[in-house]
């Protein structure tokens, strides 16, 4: 029974001791630590020290001297000590409760009430359903906007008079700038065309007036 409780002293070709199953370290963790120690090229003393710590179930040391002779001489420079890889150091990743409370981890989400329905409007809607059997939404009365009377259309005869006057003023301005010869023929042709249109309007209106007088 005693031989079964003991762990095999040495693994072939490695010099690593097998660790007992402790509460703090699972067999998978022990195997991972063996591999990491091998890759980190730790001395035999450092490996034995770490394995003994694991068998006791104690936390792994943050640093380990390469030999036992340096254990009793802490006054020497810290450069002689070999620091363990970060994965071999056991650090708790749990945050303290005070830090969680400061970050609001324990604070409850405030209740935000949703928009309530208009009870009076719902009451009127139900009354309308009971009275008429139909669900009709109340329509807001849109104020009637009075439309302004459109501006009276400018008489075509008056438009022609204004257009002729504008062309006369333009031609006078060009004459003052010494460019009247360039625009004179164009402006006079347009004025002549508009005068003929005015004569046509005058004859048509005179004819309509005579017809109206004849029927009375």
UniProtKB/Swiss-Prot annotation:
Q: What is the top-level taxon of the source organism?
A: Eukaryota
What is the organism of origin for this protein? Mus musculus
Q: Which family does it belong to?
A: Belongs to the UPF0193 (EVG1) family.
Name-wise, this protein is UPF0193 protein EVG1 homolog
Matching entries from InterPro entries are given as: UPF0193
Q: Which residues cross the membrane?
A: none
Pfam families, per this entry? UPF0193
Cysteines engaged in disulfide bonds, as pairs? none
Q: Which ranges of the sequence are coiled-coil? A: none
């Amino acid at each position: 029974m005693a031989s079964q409780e003991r762990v095999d002293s040495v693994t072939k070709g490695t010099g690593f001791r097998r660790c007992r199953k402790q509460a703090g370290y699972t067999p998978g963790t022990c195997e991972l630590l063996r591999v990491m120690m091998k890759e980190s090229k730790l001395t035999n003393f450092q490996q034995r020290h770490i394995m003994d710590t694991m068998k006791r179930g104690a936390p792994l040391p943050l640093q380990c001297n390469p030999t036992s002779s340096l254990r009793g001489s802490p006054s020497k420079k810290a450069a002689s000590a070999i620091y363990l890889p970060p994965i071999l150091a056991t650090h708790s990743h749990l945050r303290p409760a005070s830090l969680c409370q400061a970050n609001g981890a324990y604070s409850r989400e405030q209740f935000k009430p949703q928009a309530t329905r208009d009870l009076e409007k719902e009451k009127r809607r139900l009354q309308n359903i009971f009275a008429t059997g139909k669900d009709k939404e109340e329509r807001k009365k849109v104020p009637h906007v009075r439309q302004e009377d459109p501006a009276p259309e400018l008489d075509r005869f008056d438009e022609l008079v204004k257009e002729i006057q504008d062309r006369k003023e333009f031609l006078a301005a060009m004459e003052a700038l010494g460019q009247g010869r360039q625009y004179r023929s164009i402006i006079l042709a347009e004025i002549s065309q508009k005068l003929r249109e005015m004569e046509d309007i005058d004859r048509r209106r005179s004819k309509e007036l005579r017809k109206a007088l004849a029927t009375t």
